[in-house]
């Protein structure tokens, strides 16, 4: 069982801030922490704190994949020191977002009788601020979970979507439209704290680059060749959307 003194500084801060927000009467908390920082341990510790304070009865965790859901199950079971498999005597269950649609009405009627904490891992996979503007996972959350959860905790290491749709349950600033996070722990701070390593970025070249010059076209075997044998600059390459689609 993990005590608060064993938490990283950011984890302890986040637990304290989430608890304060919940106790103030607000039921949703959004934590953005860089991948690998320990979001699952933080959320499990918060869940245990809420249990110890008598603020919740049950916990549900949802994740985008079976492997992540299994990891959450193990972390919560160890931290809370209780089975976390959804069976008799368990304090909760860890499932995938895909499974929400297969949980029947009887399940939700039973769950709504209890004070429930729902943890959404990698919440950015779920979009929508209303059912008609949501993907299937976001729609299930809005329809099934939003109304029965006593508290919700959203976790994300990369809180943005390429389709620009809002993340489900998230709050955005007006008029800027920026995501409002209740707690943020970025990569720079994680590197400073020796929580994460400094990433190494590798640019993979493209072996067939073609540019148009007037009525003609020229091909190059690499970015280096393109830069040396044409008037194209490096900035031209990285700011060209079509070019970047073929470069990792």
What is the role of each PLM region?
Residues 1-32:
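Conserved pre-motif I regulatory segment
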Residues 18, 45-50:
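Hydrophobic residues on the short alpha-helix immediately C-terminal to a glycine-rich phosphate/catalytic loop
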Residues 24-46:
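Walker A/P-loop
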Residues 56-65:
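Conserved RecA-like ASCE P-loop NTPase motor core of nucleic-acid helicases/translocases
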Residues 65, 95-99, 122, 155-159:
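A short beta-strand-to-loop transition that corresponds to the Sensor-1 phosphate-sensing loop
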Residues 71-111:
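Inter-Walker segment of RecA-like/P-loop motor cores
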Residues 109-153, 158:
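SF2 helicase catalytic motif II
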Residues 164-248:
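Interdomain helical connector at the RecA1-RecA2 junction of SF1/SF2 helicase-like NTPases
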């Amino acid at each position: 069982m993990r005590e608060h003194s064993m938490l990283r500084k950011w984890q302890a801060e986040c637990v304290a801030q989430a608890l304060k927000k919940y106790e103030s009467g607000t039921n949703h908390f959004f934590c953005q922490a860089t991948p690998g920082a320990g979001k699952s341990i933080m959320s499990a510790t918060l869940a245990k704190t809420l249990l110890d304070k008598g603020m919740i009865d049950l916990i549900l965790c949802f994740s985008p994949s079976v492997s992540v859901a299994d990891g959450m199950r193990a972390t919560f079971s160890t931290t809370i020191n209780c089975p976390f498999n959804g069976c008799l005597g368990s304090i909760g269950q860890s499932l995938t977002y895909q499974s929400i649609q297969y949980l029947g009405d009887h399940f939700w009627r039973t769950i709504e009788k209890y004070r429930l904490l729902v943890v959404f891992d990698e919440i950015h996979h779920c979009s929508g601020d209303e059912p008609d503007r949501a993907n299937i996972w976001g729609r299930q959350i809005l329809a099934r979970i939003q109304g029965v959860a006593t508290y919700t905790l959203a976790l994300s290491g990369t809180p943005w979507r390429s389709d620009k749709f809002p993340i489900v349950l998230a709050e955005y600033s007006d008029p800027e439209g920026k995501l409002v996070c209740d707690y943020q722990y970025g990569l720079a701070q994680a590197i400073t704290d020796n929580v994460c390593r400094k990433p190494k970025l590798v640019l993979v070249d493209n072996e067939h680059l073609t540019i148009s010059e007037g009525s003609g076209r020229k091909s190059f075997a690499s970015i280096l060749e393109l830069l040396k044998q044409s008037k194209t600059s490096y900035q031209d390459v990285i700011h060209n959307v079509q070019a970047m689609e073929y470069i990792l």
